[in-house]
A protein has these predicted regions:
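A general structural signal for well-ordered alpha-helical segments in protein cores
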Residues: 19, 40, 58, 74-77
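Acidic, PIN/NYN-like endoribonuclease modules and their adjacent C-terminal/linker elements
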Residues: 66-67, 94, 99-124
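Alpha-helix C-terminal capping segments
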Residues: 24-30, 43, 47, 59-64, ...
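Short, well-structured N-terminal submotif of metal-dependent ribonuclease cores
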Residues: 1-34, 47-57, 124
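Acidic catalytic patch
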Residues: 14, 63-83
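Anionic, Ser/Thr-rich low-complexity intrinsically disordered regions
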Residues: 39, 45-49, 57-61, 111-123
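Alpha-helix capping/helix-boundary segments
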Residues: 7, 39, 73, 93, ...
């Protein structure tokens, strides 16, 4: 059974209106539940938007069910949101880029990653 974002968020949030139903489903189907890295990315976005601890939300969700896809990248991205104040998409780009230079006009990467600043390129 595929666990969608609202189901996992209901399990993680203390005050979610779907919390009781989600807990019942989780209790009855725990071994059959799984999700994808895309659900974790959506949880990262929702947690960021709601001012919640992104790292805690993503990490807790990843512990609740089997996750297909690249869990480590999403968890690492959530850590950058909390530790460095990045936006979720900036952190996903940062983590996914690895050691490569990021080509961007976004100054958020300064001091954290090598960046080729598009605004500093002379047009010929």
């Amino acid at each position: 059974m595929y666990a969608e974002t609202d189901f996992l968020f209901a399990l993680i949030k203390d005050d979610d209106w779907l919390g009781d139903a989600a807990e019942t489903v989780y209790r009855d189907h725990r071994d059959d539940l799984w999700t994808s890295q895309f659900t974790l990315i959506e949880l990262l976005l929702v947690a960021y938007r709601e001012g919640r601890d992104s790292e805690r939300v993503v990490t807790n969700a990843a512990r609740l069910v089997d996750v297909h896809g690249d869990v480590d990248t999403v968890v690492a991205a959530a850590t950058y949101v909390e530790d460095h104040g990045f936006t979720p998409f900036d952190t996903l780009h940062l983590v996914e880029s690895g050691d490569d230079t990021i080509v961007s006009s976004d100054g958020a990467y300064e001091g954290v990653s090598s960046r080729l600043d598009l605004t500093a390129i002379d047009e010929e």
